[in-house]
Structures are given as C-alpha cells and as structure tokens.
Amino acid sequence: MRRRVVVTGLGAITPVGNDVATTWRAMQAGVSGAANITKFDASSFPVRFACEVKGFDPLKTMERKEAKRADLYAQYAVAASVEAMADAGLTPGVYDVDRTGVIIGSGIGGLKSFEEQHDVYRERGQSKISPFFIPMFIADIAAGVVSMRFNARGPNYATVSACSTSAHAIGDAFRTIQYGDADIIISGGAEATVTPMAIGGFANMTALSDRNDSPATASRPFDLTRDGFVMGEGAGIVILEELEHARARGARIYGEVVGYRASADAYHLTGQLPEHEGLQRAMRGALADAGMRPDEVDYVNAHGTSTQLNDSNEATAIAKVFGDAAQRVSISSTKSMTGHMLGAAGAVEFIASTLAIRDGVAPPTINYCTPDPACGDLDFTPNQARSREVRAALSNSAGFGGHNVSLVVKRYQE
C-alpha cells in the first residue's frame, strides 16, 4: 500500500516577497513584482523590465565564503530551504538524516556565473577562469548545497525540465516518499535568469512582453491583449513528509499531496500540441492518481504564461478535462504577479495552491481586462482574490521541450 504524503513546510524567495508570508499576502492583494531591470544596464535591450527579487541578502542564511562560491540561484535555494525547514520544525536531531532527501532543480542553473566567467575568459584568458566556475554553474549544485546544509543523506538529485522543473521535483519527491525510499524530502526549484543573455535570448525569440512603458501591467494571462511573459526569478521549496512520520512528531500539516502525472508532447521545441493535449493527459493522470473527479477540485493554478498560444491552449485543455465542472472551478495564473520564474515557477505555484486550501481563497489573475474568446468563458479570477472553499487544488506546469506536469493537493483529513 502506498504511503500518504503531506506538506509540512514552505519556503519562498519571489519577486513579490522574500518569504512565504510576504509572498502570499502580495498574491492575495494582487501586487505586481514587475519593474525596470536593476541587475544590469538594459537600456539598449528591446525588453527593459522584469520581475526581480528585491532586497535579497544571502548572508542572512549563508556564510560569506559559502555565498561567494554559490551562484545566485543556489543562494535563493538555500534561503528558501532554510525557511521551509524552520517552518516544518525540522531542526537537527528531529529527523533521520539517512531518511531525508533533497530534490531541487533549476531550468538553467548558474547563468549569471556563466556569463561572468565567459567575460573573464574573453578579457583575461583561460588561466583566470574561477576554479569554482563549474560547481557554481551546474544545475544540480543547489540540491547538493542544500543537502550539505541539513546533512540530508537520502535521495539527492536535481530535475531539469525548463519551466516544469520544480513541479517535477515535487512530484518525484511525492513518489519517493510514497514508495518508502525516504520519509522527508526538501523539494522545489530555483532560478536566477534576470541576466543579459537570458533577457536578450528570450526577447529575440519574441517570448517576452515588451511593454516597457507599463511593466506592472505587462503580465496579463488569458487577456486578449497579452503579448508575452515577464521574466521572473527566485526559489520555491516544499517540505514533503510521510504522514505517520509527521504525525508522530506533532507537525503542522498544510495539506496532502494526492496526485502527480508527467507527460510529453513529443511535438515541438517550444510550442505545445493543439489544445495542450499533452497537458490534458497530465491533468487527467494526476486526477486518476488522486482517485478524484474534476468536480472535487475547486482551484486550478494555471501555467498561464501570458503568451498567446499557451494561454488559449491551456484554457481549452482545462475546459476539456473538467467538462461541466469547468464552469465552477476558480482558475488563476499567479505569474501575473511573480512573472515567470522558470524552474522555480512550479514550486511557488504549488505553494500558492496549498495556501489557497488553508485560507479558503483563490488568488487573482491581475491585469485581466479584456476577455479572449479563444480562452472561453472560464473563471480566471480576474484582478481580485476571491474567498471560497478550496477542498483541493490542481497546479499545472509546462516547459520547453514538451514537458508537462500536474500536481493535486487537497485538504488533509485523517
């Protein structure tokens, strides 16, 4: 019999808050994290704004030498993990280190370090490349650093699946605990891609909104006038724990993870199958895994990137999977506020889904002003959070390469 898995800790570094409480308050209030880029001189770029993390100090959670040898994405991961472990009440001696694992991914990894060291190579030659460059750059190092931080000696690896990365991480953590290979997993993702190469590359493929005169209204998922996503960054970390282990130590339980399914489009490098058929399979599979009907889900945190094709395809997919229940489910894209956090997006959105259950509130899709007929007549929770019962929530993620993930979390009941 599969073991039950619950959520006992949450941590986040986002463009709208450097902890979970601040982030969640901002989401409920409909606060946009978008503003002009400050991390580099973007004055010559076609896109000059992003959703940056603000006021982040890695020295609050890392020693100076450790922080110096870690890329920004890994610093974000450590900070969010420290919050999540404290939130879960997991202090040394409380958990079995051999039964505690880490699954933390990144869509791109240490891009900031790569760009900086490439400049060093071009300007000063090979001999001046930092000996720490490779471990700072690779996408698995956040998982490694976090495992060392907490002496977690169980399963330890990184998922890398573009914008589905941290949803895969949470799903794999769920399965790992279900099947008995660990009792606790620190799971999620981190990203730090407000850099010249990332902004330039995504802008050149016309994936980004170019509303430079109005950053705060640029991310507008499902709106007729949407013109691309807004780059985000940060980290989301979720502590998953086997139910009886959590109960034995008197842990607070946010919710129970009950469904996970991953699928592939096998279709296009950056586009989705028509009607997001691959995501439909992920949603149906996650609901089947949970043993739930669509009408038992009250909230869907959509992938909702604010790009033309994704949003219309995803809306169609939700309508097809939910059928008659699609008219009563609350749907929103929190990317309208955080921007697209790439490899960290799925975890932050799973956190929002979990808190929606706890607090009985659906966060809004901000900047939704003009309905798009291609997105149908679904309830995208426009512009204001809505109080409502949320018994269960489904969170969608999709990534370049055709990676789709759906996760289902529900209210915990003994």
What is the predicted function of each stretch?
Residues 4-8, 32-35, 213-290, 299, ...:
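Condensing-enzyme catalytic core mediating Claisen C-C bond formation in acyl metabolism
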Residues 1-2, 36-79, 99, 109-172, ...:
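Conserved catalytic cysteine-centered active-site region
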Residues 77-88, 142, 169, 241-243, ...:
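Short, well-ordered amphipathic alpha-helical segments that serve as non-catalytic structural scaffolds
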Residues 123-130, 168-171, 175, 191-248, ...:
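Glycine-/small-residue-rich "gating" segment that lines the acyl/pantetheine channel
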Residues 77-90, 139, 147-191, 229-251, ...:
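Active-site-proximal alpha-helical scaffold in enzymes
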Residues 1-66, 88, 244-254, 351-365, ...:
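ACP-dependent fatty acid/polyketide chain-elongation machinery
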Residues 181-227, 260-274, 304-311, 328-378:
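Acyl-CoA/ACP chain-elongation machinery
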Residues 84-96, 246-253, 283-299, 321-325:
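Phosphate/pyrophosphate-binding loops at sites that engage ATP/ADP/AMP, CoA/4′-phosphopantetheine
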